[in-house]
């Protein structure tokens, strides 16, 4: 019951196009993509840090 079907997705896309217009959507997607990229980079930078601390503690 919590899944979106094809009809619901098409309705959502139609509403987004009506609200933002065709010219604004590429700008929104570009901003969303850059935000996701920054988030992934930040997450990747945080992961190696604990491994380095453990190596320093063992020395």
Swiss-Prot record:
Superkingdom of the source species: Bacteria
Pfam families reported in the protein's UniProt record: TatA_B_E (PF02416)
InterPro entries, per database record: TatA/B/E (IPR003369), TatA/E (IPR006312)
Location within or outside the cell: Cell inner membrane
Membrane topology summary: Single-pass membrane protein
Transmembrane segments: 1-21
CC per GO annotation: TAT protein transport complex
A GO molecular-function annotation: protein transmembrane transporter activity
Keywords: Cell inner membrane, Cell membrane, Membrane, Protein transport, Translocation, Transmembrane, Transmembrane helix, Transport
GO biological process: protein transport by the Tat complex
Keyword presence, Metal-binding: no
Family the entry assigns: Belongs to the TatA/E family.
Function, as annotated: Part of the twin-arginine translocation (Tat) system that transports large folded proteins containing a characteristic twin-arginine motif in their signal peptide across membranes. TatA could form the protein-conducting channel of the Tat system.
Subunit: Forms a complex with TatC.
Name of the protein in its database record: Sec-independent protein translocase protein TatA
Organism annotation: Flavobacterium johnsoniae (strain ATCC 17061 / DSM 2064 / JCM 8514 / BCRC 14874 / CCUG 350202 / NBRC 14942 / NCIMB 11054 / UW101)
Gene from which the chain derives: tatA
